[in-house]
Regions:
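Poly-acidic low-complexity segments
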Residues: 6-7, 67, 87
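Surface-exposed beta-strand edges and their flanking turn/coil or helix-capping segments
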Residues: 15-19, 65, 69, 83, ...
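Hydrophobic/aromatic-rich, well-ordered segments within soluble, folded domains that form packed cores
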Residues: 50-77
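Conserved mixed alpha/beta catalytic, RNA-binding, or beta-rich assembly cores of soluble enzyme
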Residues: 1-50, 55, 60
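Generic secondary-structure signature for well-ordered alpha-helical cores
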Residues: 46, 70, 74, 103-110
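Short linear loop/turn motifs
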Residues: 36-40, 69-72, 79-86
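Long, compositionally biased
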Residues: 81-122
Length: 122
């Protein structure tokens, strides 16, 4: 998994009450900062069980991540890029946003740009 993110935006996202609550439940300490959470995620990715909380780092709505864990991937309302347990319209809007981002990235890669050129390190 390669995660491209804006540090301040990810910090704000992980600090949201619903997100932080799920992270704590999964053994994270959101108060320790983004780097500590990413280190924990990396450790969990190397483990035997898939860390479904990765969806929180990818911007999935927390109610969808919680629902997936609670219902073991069943009883969802809608399935797109992920299984939706919360607001279907909100999720569909996010799916469209993700599609636009993916398409823009693919166009740039198709033009011969490298990942470093597309996402310059600041």
């Amino acid at each position: 998994l390669v995660l491209v993110y804006r540090p301040e935006a990810l910090k704000r996202h992980l600090a949201k009450r619903a997100v932080a609550k799920l992270l704590i439940k999964a053994g994270y300490d959101p108060g320790a900062g983004v780097d500590a959470c990413l280190h924990r995620l990396r450790h969990r990715m190397e483990g035997r069980e898939f860390p479904h909380e990765v969806g929180l780092f990818l911007g999935y709505p927390p109610e969808d991540v919680a629902g997936f864990c609670r219902y073991c991937g069943q009883k969802y309302k809608y399935c797109g890029h992920w299984k939706v347990y919360g607001d279907v319209d909100q999720a569909k809007a996010l799916f469209e946003q993700y599609d636009r981002c993916r398409d823009a990235l693919c166009r740039r890669v198709g033009m011969g740009l490298s990942i470093v050129q597309i996402f310059p390190v600041v």
